[in-house]
């Protein structure tokens, strides 16, 4: 609506939107609505009370009178906090605080709730709101890809009357051309749905995730590799990919195959370590048989043993974007499994993980419990973690207890990463860990730069490592406040100051 208002300022249907996002389970009830100090009996407003008052003020404190104001609750709905909202949601439209203050909602205000489910919401609450159910498969993964392409495709060139082509300055560190975007779009359309449907029907998944999450994981790996090629290596190892589009000279024309090859191999590597990485060992064996066979001949979907996969594809109304059999110019070598190689963009080759094992001896003064014996698994995990962390993505390492996850992540944080840039903040969750304790542990390790802004020393990046993520006690209605706090940090880039109530 804000974008439409900027484009059509005279159209009264579109108004600018101001909004506040609150995860109600990342703070306590007192911090949400407000509370009396037990010693001084002084009233302190909560996060919701402050935002509600600012939006409901007449004359408006924020924006103009016709601007829309949304209070957006992004978190679990339960009987602990939602019952206090009933007076807001009924005909009174008033927020009643324990201090005795009542604030009426303005005509331009709206309350929006975005929970995962309404399993523990009371009928009194549900009857007061309009419910819109977003089915997991309704949106699909295509908008994720479209959004990624829109974020990185180069700005269109302009042509003057004399035929001179000029391209506007682009502040982004790297972009892709329209031709490269077309290759990405076609390969995703050809590979993603068959791979996801195969995993859903034929593989026992250890981690159940939505299709969109799998595609976003693929995009993040692909983006990290592209950025590594185009920015960190100054384009030298990019196999023909360039940050800015150049005139199509003969030399540039000869590089198209290399550019296509780099995109193909990067997408294959990303699919293997996202969609193909959710299964158990037996499932990986099946995916290892499927992917090369599909790349060789996509008609294997029509075989009798693939009936379940084909049925699922038909339910998705999937059609291959390729009019004829597509041939990948540099497929994953068949000497090992698809999980046995990583892609090296600098020389456009596949390199066995065995060749990337660190064979150096441990330090003589290292404690026995801290020594990690390098193998293929540590090489794979090390490369993937380095790739994601250094490109500002959040990895989640899961597995059974006692498999060495914590020890290896400590090794990555303290040995693989540049200690002059990356500053680890390590937190171990317990059953009694609260959201406020988690917030305090992180804030204490950061410098306060100005009001509402915390961060590590200038020129450095803070890496927060949460050990035993699953440990916090589950509340009566199913929420885990420390995890909700982390989700708010990842989704919105911050949290509310416990004292000032600022975001």
Residue ranges and their predicted role:
Residues 1-503:
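Conformational switch/transducer regions in large eukaryotic molecular machines and scaffolds
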């Amino acid at each position: 609506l804000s974008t439409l208002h900027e484009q059509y300022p005279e159209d009264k249907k579109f108004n600018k939107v101001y909004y506040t996002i609150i995860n109600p389970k990342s703070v306590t009830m007192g911090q949400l609505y407000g509370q009396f100090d037990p010693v001084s009996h002084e009233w302190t407003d909560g996060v919701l009370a402050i935002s509600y008052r600012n939006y409901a003020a007449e004359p408006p404190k924020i924006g103009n009178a016709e601007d829309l104001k949304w209070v957006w609750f992004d978190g679990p709905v339960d009987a602990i906090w939602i019952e206090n909202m009933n007076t807001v949601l009924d005909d009174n439209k008033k927020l009643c605080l324990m201090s005795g203050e009542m604030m009426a909602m303005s005509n331009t205000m709206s309350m929006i709730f975005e929970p995962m489910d309404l399993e523990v919401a009371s009928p009194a609450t549900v009857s007061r709101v309009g419910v819109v159910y977003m089915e997991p498969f309704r949106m699909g993964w295509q908008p994720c890809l479209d959004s990624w392409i829109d974020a990185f495709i180069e700005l269109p060139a302009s042509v003057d009357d004399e035929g001179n082509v000029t391209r506007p300055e682009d502040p982004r560190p790297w972009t892709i051309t329209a031709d490269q975007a077309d290759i990405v779009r076609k390969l995703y359309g050809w590979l993603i749905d068959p791979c996801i449907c195969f995993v859903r029907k034929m593989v026992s998944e250890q981690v159940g995730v939505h299709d969109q999450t799998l595609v976003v994981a693929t995009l993040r790996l692909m983006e990290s590799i592209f950025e590594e090629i185009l920015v960190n290596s100054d384009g030298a190892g990019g196999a023909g990919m360039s940050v800015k589009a150049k005139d199509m000279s003969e030399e540039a024309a000869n590089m198209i195959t290399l550019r296509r090859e780099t995109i193909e191999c990067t997408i294959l590597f990303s699919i293997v370590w996202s969609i193909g990485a959710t299964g158990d060992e037996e499932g990986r064996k099946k995916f290892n048989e499927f992917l090369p066979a599909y790349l060789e001949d996509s008609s294997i979907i029509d075989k009798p043993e693939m009936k379940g996969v084909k049925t699922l594809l038909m339910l998705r109304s999937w059609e291959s974007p390729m009019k004829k059999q597509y041939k990948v110019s540099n497929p994953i070598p068949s000497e090992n499994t698809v999980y046995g190689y990583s892609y090296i963009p600098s020389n456009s080759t596949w390199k066995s993980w065995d060749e990337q094992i660190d064979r150096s001896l441990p330090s003589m003064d290292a404690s026995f419990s801290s020594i990690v014996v390098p193998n293929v698994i540590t090489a794979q995990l090390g490369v993937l973690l380095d790739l994601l962390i250094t490109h500002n993505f959040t990895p989640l390492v899961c597995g059974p207890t006692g498999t060495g996850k914590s020890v290896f992540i400590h090794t990555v944080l303290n040995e693989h990463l540049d200690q002059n840039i990356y500053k680890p903040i390590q937190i171990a969750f317990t059953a009694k860990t609260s959201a406020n304790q988690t917030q305090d542990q992180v804030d204490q390790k950061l410098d306060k730069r100005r009001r509402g802004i915390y961060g590590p020393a200038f020129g450095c990046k803070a890496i927060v490592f949460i050990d035993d993520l699953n440990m916090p006690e589950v509340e009566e209605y199913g929420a885990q406040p420390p995890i909700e706090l982390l989700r708010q940090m990842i989704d919105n880039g911050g949290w509310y100051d416990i004292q000032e109530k600022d975001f």
